[in-house]
Amino acid sequence: MFFFGIEHEVAFLNHEGKFADFSCTKFADFQQIVDKLPLYPHDYPQLRVGDAGIKKKRWYIEGFERFADSEAVIDCVAKGIEIRTTINSTIQGAIDELTASFYLLRETAASFGFSPVLISFNPYTCVFEPQPPLNDFELRQLQAYPDEQTAHIYMVSYGPDLNISIADLPIENVIDIGKKLTYYSPFIVPFSYSSPFYNGSLWEGLSVRTFIRTGKRSATLVFVENQEHLIKSVPSLTKIARIPAEVGRIEFKACDSCDNFSIYAGLLALLKGLALDKTLEGRAIVPDTTLHQISAKAGFDHDDIFLNATKVLQAAENALENDPDIKFLAPLKDILANRKTKSHQLIEMFENLGSIEETIKRTYV
């Protein structure tokens, strides 16, 4: 039996129509929105709250936590608001919950002058530099956790975690699926491309987020229960589960954000199909940076990316032959047939409108 969940990062424009990032938005600006959103007590213990207490709801502020000289959080530099679903037994259930949570967030944010926009990489700021500079305690914390040393990337990028797990599957098999998804990631991610903006203008490709993050951030992360199942790698493939509900979870982290949630449904079905597939033999512990960067620039216009994406999609479709979830693959098949991603639409709109803000205002419609 499969289980599904989605974590979706939302960026905003403020009441002035400016992109609301850490340069002009405080933690309290976003927290006032989260404070107005409901708390569902039955969500726990499957949702992780975390030590700082920021992650109390289905919505929470995504950002960079600051410390004094102890583990007590004294501030959080905000980049946006994340929506997370509970664990669902169906893909449709996860999509329905995400959709309901998104509409509630949009309605609540509007009362404070914020409107959600589709962004997968900060269109103006390329690098996050903590101010004031990191203190000795913070530097020691980062040195202890190599993946946490990439704050300069995750604070300017926005993307989903697409989560699947399979009941009672031995952890060795779960890790093998994680290796498989890492290997085929360059051919999966173009279905989601939505980051064609960089440093105030158009980038020379379709996903600057993919181009910059690959090799430094995980493509897939598998949560394990015991230390002996950890595989040492940078970026990480495996991580110790922080709560029991995380054990055996596979998080696919490489995709750009989507404003059409049917693409998330398609991607979850694709991941499910690849987990079931017995024909594809590729495995990798760390993502192939070169292939991801080729993919990021050309997408499905690159013949190797297109052919391998076709192979991956076909393998998933074959594995789901008698599964009703096969229907969720339809949007991905359309994207592949046309070789057009969301980035293509955004580029065309930008060329017509001449403004990044005016372009992204037309997302989430």
Where are these regions (language model features)?
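An acidic/histidine-cluster motif and surrounding catalytic segment
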Residues: L162
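Flexible glycine-rich active-site/ligand-binding loops centered on an Asp-His dyad
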Residues: L181-V189
